[in-house]
Regions:
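Beta-sandwich/jelly-roll carbohydrate-recognition scaffolds of carbohydrate-active enzymes
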Residues: 1-207
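Conserved small/polar residues in nucleotide/adenosyl-binding loops
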Residues: 211-216
């Protein structure tokens, strides 16, 4: 994904959650000129202190951050590779040697609420080993659909690595409740859509049930 993140907003929500959104722009492959991605990050330990920074300005004790909307396109870069000021939140914990902190994150192209719903439906627990086992089982099922005979070990490694990359890049854009973003309205310029307008759409319920897998 050759895109630049701008206009990021993040805030603390309660003792153990950070949520917000950011806009992505500058896609080499085309599509909408700006796409917003919402996110939720949950922690299994209370955050004692949060600092923020944006565009080189550090603000201790501030639980929210709003990043710049501006970005600068690099010379001879076409539609991609734009530079933008960085921004973020720094989370501090009261920990002792040997303590572990777990976090999980979920995204949505529609809303923060949907990102939270996705997390609740797909990973409502804190069992790390169960998540790892589920991930291994799912990847083995997908990669095991093709058996390769002959060739060297390096050639097989390259084949399965390329297959993994192919599967990894085919993400869903609809949420657990069937809502998805429609950015098809706007001015077409080649493979790009300029001034794309966001519309929230809804998949039929039967489609949602078909593609929903149970949590471990």
């Amino acid at each position: 994904e050759t895109a630049t993140m701008v206009n990021a907003h993040a805030q603390r929500n309660g003792d153990n959650e950070i949520c917000g959104y950011f806009d992505t722009r500058g896609r080499l492959w085309g599509g909408p000129d700006v796409v917003r991605i919402y996110f939720v990050v949950q922690l299994d330990k209370v955050a004692e202190h949060i600092d923020s920074w944006a565009d080189g300005i550090y603000e201790p004790g501030k639980n929210t951050v709003a990043a710049s909307k501006r970005s600068t396109r690099r010379e001879a870069s076409g539609w991609s590779y734009e530079d933008a000021p960085t921004a973020g939140l720094k989370v501090k914990f009261d920990v002792q040697p040997g303590d572990q902190i777990q976090l999980k994150t979920s995204v949505s192209f529609v809303s923060v609420e949907n990102a939270r719903l996705n997390m609740s439906a797909e990973c409502s627990h804190w069992d790390f080993d169960a998540v790892r086992k589920q991930s291994q089982t799912e990847w083995n099922e997908w990669l095991g659909r093709i058996d390769v005979d002959g060739g060297s070990d390096n050639q097989k490694i390259k084949f399965y690595t390329d297959l993994w990359h192919t599967l990894l890049g085919r993400h869903k854009i609809d949420d657990i409740n069937g809502e998805y973003p429609d950015y098809t309205q706007g001015e077409r310029q080649g493979t790009h859509t300029i001034n794309a307008q966001f519309k929230k759409r809804q998949l039929p319920l039967n489609n949602c049930l078909l593609y929903t897998s149970p949590s471990p």
